[in-house]
């Protein structure tokens, strides 16, 4: 079969489109996988600080089971201007089974992570903070650990004295969040519907339990994603094992399955699916093969013409 220049060009375009479509859903700049950092102790898409310790094989420890620590990680680039979904694998644990604290937080805020008193993050932030608070300081009659959501306006401080009671716009109990196994947190932001949903699958389970749904949610024009944690007089370790983010569309909302928990459970995203670089390499190799076939066929046709000319 002869490959015309037009056919090869169309095949090349088709291959490029397929490669692009395969990558559009995955947000590499908002995802994190082992080994997390390069040999220069840096990550292209994330920055970290405070007490954060990165174990290239075992995870990112925002704090260890040590008193008076605070650590954070934050994206270098903002979240997309469209709808998106985040699935993150985390663990909260300590040697003590009775006294432990203080908690881990997930932020979608205009500020990148800076050291501060709100679970290791700066106070008076602009955006949304989701706090997994593991110790009840001044909330009698309220079960802890607990997930508490705060909408920051850039001016209002966090209500330290009452574990965020004055700031709380939604919450749910998270009694099973502490333990030896990993939890999965899933956040889904629907920009068109202005909705924000958060779910948790506890202790190795892949069955998500809805924590809250928020309506009329508008993120800051420029929004960064951050995780932070802190310990005080009590302590526990706060670990992030992996983060997977992707864009979502109206079609996804109606029929496309969400990110399956199995993609993170017991492994990291990078061990399950290739990165953009791998996809690009595969695409380039495919194009090379196509053009090699075209060149070979063109050479054969030219040789046949030369042979006929010689015979004549």
From Swiss-Prot:
<dbReference type="InterPro" id="IPR013320">
    <property type="entry name" value="ConA-like_dom_sf"/>
</dbReference>
<keyword id="KW-1133">Transmembrane helix</keyword>
<dbReference type="GO" id="GO:0030134">
    <property type="term" value="C:COPII-coated ER to Golgi transport vesicle"/>
</dbReference>
<feature type="topological domain" description="Cytoplasmic">
    <location>
        <begin position="302"/>
        <end position="312"/>
    </location>
</feature>
<keyword id="KW-0333">Golgi apparatus</keyword>
<keyword id="KW-0256">Endoplasmic reticulum</keyword>
<dbReference type="GO" id="GO:0005793">
    <property type="term" value="C:endoplasmic reticulum-Golgi intermediate compartment"/>
</dbReference>
<keyword id="KW-0472">Membrane</keyword>
<feature type="signal peptide">
    <location>
        <begin position="1"/>
        <end position="22"/>
    </location>
</feature>
<dbReference type="GO" id="GO:0000329">
    <property type="term" value="C:fungal-type vacuole membrane"/>
</dbReference>
<dbReference type="GO" id="GO:0005789">
    <property type="term" value="C:endoplasmic reticulum membrane"/>
</dbReference>
<dbReference type="InterPro" id="IPR005052">
    <property type="entry name" value="Lectin_leg"/>
</dbReference>
<dbReference type="GO" id="GO:0006888">
    <property type="term" value="P:endoplasmic reticulum to Golgi vesicle-mediated transport"/>
</dbReference>
<keyword id="KW-0732">Signal</keyword>
<keyword id="KW-0812">Transmembrane</keyword>
<dbReference type="GO" id="GO:0005794">
    <property type="term" value="C:Golgi apparatus"/>
</dbReference>
<feature type="domain" description="L-type lectin-like">
    <location>
        <begin position="24"/>
        <end position="248"/>
    </location>
</feature>
<dbReference type="GO" id="GO:0005783">
    <property type="term" value="C:endoplasmic reticulum"/>
</dbReference>
<dbReference type="Pfam" id="PF03388">
    <property type="entry name" value="Lectin_leg-like"/>
</dbReference>
<feature type="transmembrane region" description="Helical">
    <location>
        <begin position="281"/>
        <end position="301"/>
    </location>
</feature>
<dbReference type="GO" id="GO:0005537">
    <property type="term" value="F:D-mannose binding"/>
</dbReference>
<protein>
    <recommendedName>
        <fullName>L-type lectin-like domain-containing protein C126.08c</fullName>
    </recommendedName>
</protein>
<dbReference type="GO" id="GO:0000139">
    <property type="term" value="C:Golgi membrane"/>
</dbReference>
<keyword id="KW-0926">Vacuole</keyword>
<feature type="topological domain" description="Extracellular">
    <location>
        <begin position="23"/>
        <end position="280"/>
    </location>
</feature>
<dbReference type="InterPro" id="IPR051136">
    <property type="entry name" value="Intracellular_Lectin-GPT"/>
</dbReference>
């Amino acid at each position: 079969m002869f490959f015309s220049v037009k056919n090869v060009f169309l095949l090349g375009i088709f291959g490029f489109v397929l490669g692009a479509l395969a990558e559009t859903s995955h947000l590499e700049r908002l995802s994190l996988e082992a080994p997390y950092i390069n040999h220069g102790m840096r990550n292209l898409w994330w920055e970290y600080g405070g007490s954060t310790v990165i174990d290239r094989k075992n995870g990112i420890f925002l704090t260890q089971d040590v008193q008076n620590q605070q650590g954070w990680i934050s994206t270098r680039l903002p979240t997309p201007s469209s709808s998106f979904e985040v699935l993150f694998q985390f663990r909260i644990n300590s040697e003590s089974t009775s006294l432990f604290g203080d908690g881990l937080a997930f932020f979608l805020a205009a500020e990148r992570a800076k050291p501060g008193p709100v679970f290791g993050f700066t106070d008076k932030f602009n955006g949304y903070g989701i706090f997994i608070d593991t110790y009840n300081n001044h909330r009698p009659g309220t079960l802890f650990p607990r997930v508490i959501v705060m909408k920051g306006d850039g001016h209002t401080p966090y209500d330290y004295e009452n574990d965020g009671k004055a700031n709380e716009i939604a919450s749910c109990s998270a009694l099973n969040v502490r333990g030896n196994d990993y939890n999965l947190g899933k956040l889904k932001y629907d920009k068109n519907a202005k909705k924000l949903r958060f779910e948790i699958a506890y202790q190795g389970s892949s069955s998500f339990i809805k924590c809250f749904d928020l309506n009329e949610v508008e993120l800051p024009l420029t929004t960064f994603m951050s995780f932070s944690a802190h310990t005080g007089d009590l302590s526990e370790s706060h670990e992030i094992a992996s983060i997977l983010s992707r864009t979502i569309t109206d079609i996804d909302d109606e029929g496309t399955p969400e990110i399956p928990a199995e993609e993170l459970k017991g492994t990291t995203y990078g061990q399950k699916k290739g990165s953009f670089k791998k996809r690009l390499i595969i695409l380039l190799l495919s194009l090379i093969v196509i053009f090699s076939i075209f060149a070979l066929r063109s050479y054969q046709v030219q040789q046949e013409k030369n042979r006929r000319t010689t015979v004549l």
